[in-house]
Amino acid sequence: SYAPLLAKKGQTNWNPDLIYFDNTKVYPTCSYYVQQMFGTTAGDYYYGDVAKVEGADKFQGTSCVLNTEKRELYIKVVNAAAEAKKTAINLSRFKNLPAKATMTTISGQPDVENNYEVQPIAPVTKEVNISKKMNITAEPYSCSVIRIKL
């Protein structure tokens, strides 16, 4: 959970909140988008060996879960470093993989944040090619989720 969720402009007691609003506008924060990305990609089976980072990297984390009801595989990659990082993905255990998947990424410099005038940090979704063994590059300061329909 995340509290507080909503904050009205000029009425906040602390930072951060997830969604800010005034009488005419609403803007979600970067944290809101990350919560949304992870909240919509929950799984009930974890695969600890599908996504691997190079070496012992304290700035990068990965997770791979299967939602058995939706028959979707979710690979999550977080890169908290100032430089791009590679992640090796091994999907050999999965049969009948599609050729394409979607990847949603949110990224931005640590000192940039959304506000009432501009929202420079928002998720971008694109189609990606997938294969049994592949590498992806995680952008600096990014969070990505790859959705694969099985």
Where do the language-model regions lie?
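Carbohydrate-binding surface patches
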Residues: K58-L97, M103, R147
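Acidic, Ser/Thr/Pro-rich beta/coil linker or hinge segments at domain junctions
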Residues: F94-A138
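Flexible loop/turn segments at secondary-structure boundaries
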Residues: L6-Q11, A82-K85, P110-E113
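Conserved, mostly hydrophobic/aromatic
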Residues: Q35, I75, Y141
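Active-site-proximal beta-strand/loop segments in catalytic clefts of secreted hydrolases
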Residues: Y2-L5, V78, I106
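Short Pro-Gly-centered flexible turn/kink motifs
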Residues: T137-I148
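Aromatic/acidic polysaccharide-binding cleft in carbohydrate-active enzymes
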Residues: S1-E69
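Surface-exposed coil/turn segments at beta-strand junctions on protein surfaces, enriched
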Residues: T68, A80-A82, N129-S131, A138-E139
